[in-house]
């Protein structure tokens, strides 16, 4: 029996499985939306992976995790995590807009989620802390990243219309 009032995302596909036709086809059979953890990329793979997901699953996808680390000016060692790395906090903002503009251009993407609200704890030396958050460890919003994300998010529907021309 199926509850048609629920949205089923299934398990989040990450790593190699998200590139495997059989896995994506199986997810498409049961999921309403394919959930993807999408890391280590400057640009979404519009003509390869994203096109494959559309063909294999015949369902939209949601990027359930992504982030970019600023490695030179975050006061964290940034040795952990799968996020794409750029030199500075300002470049994290550019990376956000670049990546999400690509997702808006994809006809089968229904949204995205930045992985983490706050950076990893910089005092926890056991876990190799990284710059993953929208906020630093003093609860200060990264201003440039916030501005660029807000600017893109407020204009998302107009941008979709532009890409649909």
Q: Which residues are covered by each model-predicted region?
A:
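Short, exposed beta-strand "edge-strand" segments with a Pro/Gly-rich flavor and a Y/T-containing core
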Residues: 1, 81-87, 139-140
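Glycoside hydrolase catalytic-domain groove-lining segments
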Residues: 3-81, 97-101
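Short, low-complexity, polar/charged sequence segments that are solvent-exposed and flexible
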Residues: 30, 53-56, 81-84, 131-136, ...
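C-terminal structured "cap/appendage" subdomains that terminate the fold
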Residues: 82-134
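Aromatic-rich peripheral "rim/lid" segments of glycoside hydrolase catalytic domains that contact
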Residues: 115-165
């Amino acid at each position: 029996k199926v509850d048609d009032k629920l949205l089923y995302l299934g398990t989040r596909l990450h790593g190699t499985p998200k590139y495997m036709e059989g896995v994506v086809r199986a997810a498409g059979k049961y999921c309403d939306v394919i959930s993807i953890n999408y890391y280590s990329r400057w640009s979404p793979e519009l003509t390869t992976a994203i096109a494959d997901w559309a063909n294999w699953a015949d369902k939209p996808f949601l990027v359930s995790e992504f982030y970019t680390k600023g490695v030179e000016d975050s006061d964290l060692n940034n040795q952990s995590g799968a996020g794409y790395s750029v030199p500075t906090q300002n470049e994290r903002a550019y990376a956000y807009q670049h990546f999400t503009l690509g997702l808006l251009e994809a006809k089968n993407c229904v949204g995205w989620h930045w992985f983490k609200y706050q950076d990893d704890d910089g005092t926890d030396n056991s876990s190799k802390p990284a710059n993953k958050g929208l906020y630093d460890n003093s609860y200060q919003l990264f201003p440039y990243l916030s501005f660029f994300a807000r600017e893109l998010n407020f204009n998302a529907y107009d941008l979709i219309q532009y890409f649909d021309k």
